[in-house]
Amino acid sequence: MLSLDQIPHHIRHGIVGSRLIQIRGRVTQVTGTLLKAVVPGVRIGELCYLRNPDNSLSLQAEVIGFAQHQALLIPLGEMYGISSNTEVSPTGTMHQVGVGEHLLGQVLDGLGQPFDGGHLPEPAAWYPVYQDAPAPMSRKLITTPLSLGIRVIDGLLTCGEGQRMGIFAAAGGGKSTLLASLIRSAEVDVTVLALIGERGREVREFIESDLGEEGLRKAVLVVATSDRPSMERAKAGFVATSIAEYFRDQGKRVLLLMDSVTRFARAQREIGLAAGEPPTRRGYPPSVFAALPRLMERAGQSSKGSITALYTVLVEGDDMTEPVADETRSILDGHIILSRKLAAANHYPAIDVLRSASRVMNQIVSKEHKTWAGDLRRLLAKYEEVELLLQIGEYQKGQDKEADQAIERIGAIRGWLCQGTHELSHFNETLNLLETLTQ
């Protein structure tokens, strides 16, 4: 008879980690979106199956905590059909998503399954939805500009390959229009887009009207609409990040877009409050502010490829001190502020240049580029300073040379800042026009 030490390591590891006895529990309490069940041996993050004895229900749920020897679970689907007779069977595994080249052009739900209920080919690999960010010392430095094809960003808010930036805007600020332009024009190999908490009507409209066949060809969409359970909406961000990590591991340059972090945080808030966490700032429990860096730190450069990430944040009443906006801005490497005033004036992309910043721009652009961008910012700031005087007819030409220059060039500057949604501007072309504007 073989002893355990004589069995090969990989087989021994599987035997030790496996459950040789099937464990089943039973639902003991349902409160809102939270289930309680007695299920010995389960772990936080583990998936369990919920089944009724008459096979009228088959649903997955995730363990999110424990209370008085009972497991707290959040279902990954609708609660209808759960009863006091519902059995809980642990799977012994955490949530994983199937990844591979076959995902390009696909629209997935928040759990990584086909949005239309169809079937996907056999995946090349399985990636855990929750995993650690790359170690800080293993990350490559951000040294290369990434052309996003948007003049105002490439010229004045240059984004580096592997950088993480936030797009902050109120409702109607032009976020979706900007995201569609980025998908079409960014010089990357793969784009992964997570649409979290969007209205169902807007999803197909965005795919067919804004994104188009060309944009979808090199993209993967993860969609969790506003009517989906909170766990699916929260998981959508992690699923999209895992898919982006797979393509990064294949040596590709990946653009990860998430719309929006605010709705992701609201889903996390629902889960945290259901689990009994105390509400803190604006009703958000502590787990929300722990989840944000855990999600965002996974983007960036690795030794093989890169994930450049842009996260949209809904700002209520232009309040940048709102908890989610404030926390997100402190985590990311830059912020792009969209202005409702510019959007109302049909100025797209509606980016408020003077309130926006890229924290790595000075390290990745040439000395000349830095000078031209600084000169244009000064002209915009000077024009904003004298704009009210111009409107009331009190400005006297000749009193301020720089103000005269700003007034003279503002038309050309605004023309350069505006860009059609289907208009592509290459990086070198953007720099040439920027140089012309500031000479």
Curated annotation (Swiss-Prot):
Residues annotated for ATP binding in this entry: G172, G173, G174, K175, S176, T177
Native organism taxonomy: Bacteria, Pseudomonadati, Pseudomonadota, Gammaproteobacteria, Enterobacterales
Disruption phenotype: Deletion mutant secretes neither Yops nor the ruler and needle subunits.
EC numbers: 7.4.2.8
The keyword Transcription regulation belongs to this UniProt entry's keyword annotation: no
Protein name as annotated: Type 3 secretion system ATPase
GO biological process, one term: protein secretion by the type III secretion system
Keywords for this protein: ATP-binding, Cytoplasm, Nucleotide-binding, Plasmid, Protein transport, Translocase, Transport, Virulence
First-tier enzyme category under EC: translocase
Known partners and oligomeric status: The core secretion machinery of the T3SS is composed of approximately 20 different proteins, including cytoplasmic components, a base, an export apparatus and a needle. This subunit is part of the cytosolic complex. Forms homohexamers. Interacts directly with YscL/SctL (stator protein). YscN assembly requires the presence of YscC/SctC (the secretin), YscJ/SctJ (the outer inner ring protein), YscQ/SctQ (the major sorting platform component), YscK/SctK and YscL/SctL. Interacts with the Yersinia outer protein R (YopR) in a secretion signal-dependent manner.
Disulphide bridges: none
Keyword Repeat: no
InterPro entries with a match to the protein in the record: AAA+_ATPase, ATPase_a/bsu_AS, ATPase_alpha/beta_chains, ATPase_F1/V1/A1_a/bsu_N, ATPase_F1/V1/A1_a/bsu_nucl-bd, ATPase_T3SS_FliI/YscN, ATPase_T3SS_SctN, P-loop_NTPase
PANTHER family found in the cross-reference section: ATP SYNTHASE (PTHR15184), SPI-1 TYPE 3 SECRETION SYSTEM ATPASE (PTHR15184:SF9)
Superkingdom classification of source: Bacteria
Family: Belongs to the ATPase alpha/beta chains family. T3SS ATPase subfamily.
